[in-house]
Amino acid sequence: MWNSVQCAVQGRGHIKSNTPCQDKTYYLNENDTSVIALADGAGSASMSHFGAELVTQKICRLLTQQFDIYFNEEDGVAIKRVIVGTLLEGLGKLAQDLDCEVKDLASTLLVAAVKNGKYIILHIGDGVIGYVKNGELKIASHPENGEFVNTTVFVTSKDALSTMKMMKGQLNGITGFALISDGTEASLYNKREKSLAPAFKKIMDLSKIMKADCLQNEMERSFENVIKNSTTDDCSLIILVEEDYSFPGYRKLSEAQKRDFLSLSGSLCVGKRLKRYDDIIDYLENPKDLFQVSKHIHLRKKYCRKHIDYLMSKNFVIAQKGKYSTAIILDKD
């Protein structure tokens, strides 16, 4: 089973000009196929946010229906032609509905799909596609620039078909994919070294042990408070990660495994600390404030806060609206 987490936030420049967020992400899991897609609407195209939304949804539906056909077809150009043609047909109909030109719906497109140990990657335009293989973070596809400086290729561009990248193969140790827009590149992609920031690996690792809604909230907070401050552009990210069946949930971990997860070692009081952390983690299954936690574990608030801060540093606990709650998955169904 593959899971997805996604985030798209309006850039500072678009907030100032009252322009909608033009980055769109989408995830679909059907027919034993999991697909993620990201599209960055062209800043020069007035309706690009509508186009970005359409192409992400349409490509995900297309790949859940045609994955095997596309994977087994040896003529890559023929597949690309069908995909681009299908997307342009959808954009043409949308342009009629919105009473605009197809070029007004221009966007890039990044896609990763998996099914039964196989993958397909598609890329038109800028943005970056990364993946994790055997625990190592790698790049599958770098940004594709246009003919002129500071330009890129869009699904609606005349050279979309000729520049479109398509990769497919066996997963063989690949456990996650990440798609990022060019706005997010400023913080999470090193152009000189052509490498992704270690934060991606951390997000993917956390997605295997953290509750999906908690990870989603933390990603959104990070994007709002950190990522988007590095650029005026919209910022988006979507990841697809294989579930870690070796993690049964925190409550089923052995004491040694819990110590390892919490980095507890070399302390004479480690057993006592672990027991206290267990108590806090269980108690915060439902949100509580500091006073409630302090009262429950019979510890003064300033010392209680230190324990909670430590658990937050390990991403086991998160804080929202003055209350704390457990972020780590306690039990798996």
Model segments located where?
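Hydrophobic residues embedded in beta-strands of well-ordered beta-sheets
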Residues: T33-V35, Y119-I120, I129, L137-K138, ...
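C-terminal catalytic subdomain
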Residues: T163-D333
